[in-house]
Amino acid sequence: MGEGGESLSGAASRFRADWQALDPSGRVCLAVSGGPDSLALMLLMQEVAPRDFCVATVDHGLRAESAAEAAMVAGLCEMRGIAYHTLRLDLAGGSAVQERARKARYAALADLARRDGLSAVVTAHHADDQAETLVMRLNRGAGLRGLAGMRAASSVPGAGEVRLLRPLLGWRRAELVALVEDAGLAPVLDPSNHDHRYERVRIRDVMASTKALLPSGFAASASHLAEADAALEWAVERLWLDIGMSAEGSTWNPPEDLPRVLALRLLERVVMHLGGTVPRGPDLVRWLATLRAGGVATLAGVKGDARSGAWRFSRAPEHRSDRRPD
């Protein structure tokens, strides 16, 4: 058993509770790169739900070694009797390659889930990943939604109908590495995980170099913030019913003491409902200021008019170009 680790059977008992808490249904697809985190996920799932998953490895085509790494995962799956898929992409290198690879990877996994009738995509993000994400978003001045970090259950980005499950958010990286070592598996070691050109790698190294920063504490805080964000969405849902939004718009008298954060969430939903796009945060702030001042402005094809006191929302005439609120 690896240093600081636990037996696979003991870990599986713990994982079973984490997995069942996500209320999984039907077969799911595990995203397995061959790294220690995703191999540990595969080991745990085979202990807990051996008939309920398949494995998918995405070969982005960005490194010469990627085809061999995908073949390694395929070989492991064959030995263990696990159904697997290798999804090959042809991405070009260059700027923002990690973000482009992430989007393409999720799109490929979502396509597989739709095609094969799988109920969810499952990834091996863990507590250390969550802590790094939280620090990155703190550096950017993120709001509550961003600081809530990764959710244990959400939707695949760009494919809202496909569930995305992350059952390992309460697990540390070292625990997962130990499970893989104890199983005698040799994981893939991606060199980009040590490339200091990437912000996440720099943050990871700083957090590892000091005992003053506890990833488990960051991850717990992200979980608490996610609960607060869910409570905010609960309130927005109820206010949305008061607005009575139709396909053409609505007129609404907002409470005078409506908290700013609720107002911004509601305006975001108005724009998404009538304009079909997700507005930028700074534009929403300016739009809210205009409405609270009794003005009129258009944002992303949606007109907001508060000159009568009530807030009236409608689609802007198509021949007029959208302008940002003053």
From Swiss-Prot:
GO BP annotation list: tRNA modification
GO CC term, one of those recorded: cytoplasm
Coiled-coil ranges from the UniProt annotation: none
* Single Gene Ontology MF annotation: ATP binding
Q: What catalytic reaction does the record list?
A: cytidine(34) in tRNA(Ile2) + L-lysine + ATP = lysidine(34) in tRNA(Ile2) + AMP + diphosphate + H(+)
Q: What is its EC number?
A: 6.3.4.19
Where it sits in the cell: the answer is: Cytoplasm
According to its UniProt record, which protein family does this protein belong to? Belongs to the tRNA(Ile)-lysidine synthase family.
Q: Which gene encodes it?
A: tilS
What is this protein's function per UniProt? Answer: Ligates lysine onto the cytidine present at position 34 of the AUA codon-specific tRNA(Ile) that contains the anticodon CAU, in an ATP-dependent manner. Cytidine is converted to lysidine, thus changing the amino acid specificity of the tRNA from methionine to isoleucine.
Q: Which UniProt keywords apply?
A: ATP-binding, Cytoplasm, Ligase, Nucleotide-binding, tRNA processing
Cite the SUPFAM superfamilies for this sequence. Answer: Adenine nucleotide alpha hydrolases-like (SSF52402)
Enzyme class, spelled out? ligase
Q: What is its main location?
A: cytoplasm
User: Quick check: keyword Ligase in the entry?
Assistant: yes
What name does UniProt use for this protein? Answer: tRNA(Ile)-lysidine synthase
Would you say which domain of life the source belongs to?
Bacteria
